[in-house]
Amino acid sequence: MEGSNGFGIDSILSHRAGSPALPKGDPLLGDCRSPLELSPRSESSSDCSSPASPGRDCLETGTPRPGGASGPGLDSHLQPGQLSAPAQSRTVTSSFLIRDILADCKPLAACAPYSSSGQPAAPEPGGRLAAKAAEDFRDKLDKSGSNASSDSEYKVKEEGDREISSSRDSPPVRLKKPRKARTAFTDHQLAQLERSFERQKYLSVQDRMELAASLNLTDTQVKTWYQNRRTKWKRQTAVGLELLAEAGNYSALQRMFPSPYFYPQSLVSNLDPGAALYLYRGPSAPPPALQRPLVPRILIHGLQGASEPPPPLPPLAGVLPRAAQPR
């Protein structure tokens, strides 16, 4: 391999024989020697160890030193790319150990080997530094990504803990029950329910079940209808009592609601003391029924067109007593 490349001992000696004589202590000769000629006792090691020697400057710049001539063999084998490569490697490596300084004095073929394409290869220390910088950058990216992922996981965990704590602290929200659809009763069902309600305002469990079975309804539907109907009946009754109290027809009021009966407090408060006393202390026996209905008699008399007023009705058996006058 050394003979084929032209950098062996024989080739270097043959080039030295063909070149003009150089001074004995010339630093250029000491720099261009092979590592086989170098020894720890040689004085040329001082030339290799000094970074500012003129021989090194001549080799690195590729120009002959003033006062000395370079051989034609060396000029044919030395290229600017080969000479600049050791300088670049030496500038990149900042170590000042003896081992590193002696490594800079290796042969020219080892300093800048030719690539397959004919171009000089990139210096090895620079490539190592670039690869190391890329690896450091990747490590930093991985660390930052892991830190970001851990931070996001920690934030998600904190939000979950806050939601759990807030749900524990806050009272449970009661969901509204879905409103049931109203039952559509038929005319026949409504008529039967109204008849049953006229007979009795409150149904027993057995009567309610029988009525529901006869009308093809559920027990709950019949119960709900009766509750709504009783509410409507009480409201209408309260309005009728107020109208009768305003008109002063206490006898009709007694016929509608025989004693004992629980009258609303609002109705009793609007009545005079005598009427209120009569409502609570009236006769327990029901009053006798009228001999003739009142409304049809008035209507028939109005239809006849008689100018004379209708004859007076016979007096009722139960007459409202007058309030006792204070003496």
Swiss-Prot record:
Any single GO CC term annotated in Swiss-Prot or TrEMBL for this entry: nucleus
UniProt feature, compositional bias: Low complexity: 33-54, 316-327
Polar residues bias (residue ranges): 79-90
CDD domains noted in UniProt: homeodomain (cd00086)
Alphabetic keyword roster: DNA-binding, Homeobox, Nucleus, Transcription, Transcription regulation
Region feature (Disordered): 1-90, 112-184, 305-327
Pfam families membership: Homeodomain
Residue ranges the record marks as coiled coil: none
GO terms classed as biological process: midbrain development; negative regulation of outer hair cell apoptotic process; neuron migration; outer hair cell apoptotic process; regulation of transcription by RNA polymerase II; sensory perception of sound
GO molecular-function term, one example from the UniProt record: sequence-specific double-stranded DNA binding
Localization in the cell: Nucleus
Residue ranges, compositional bias (Basic and acidic residues): 133-143, 152-166
UniProt-listed PANTHER family: HOMEO BOX HB9 LIKE A-RELATED, VENT HOMEOBOX
Family from the record: Belongs to the BAR homeobox family.
Protein name: BarH-like 1 homeobox protein
The species this protein was found in: Homo sapiens
Encoding gene, per UniProt annotation: BARHL1
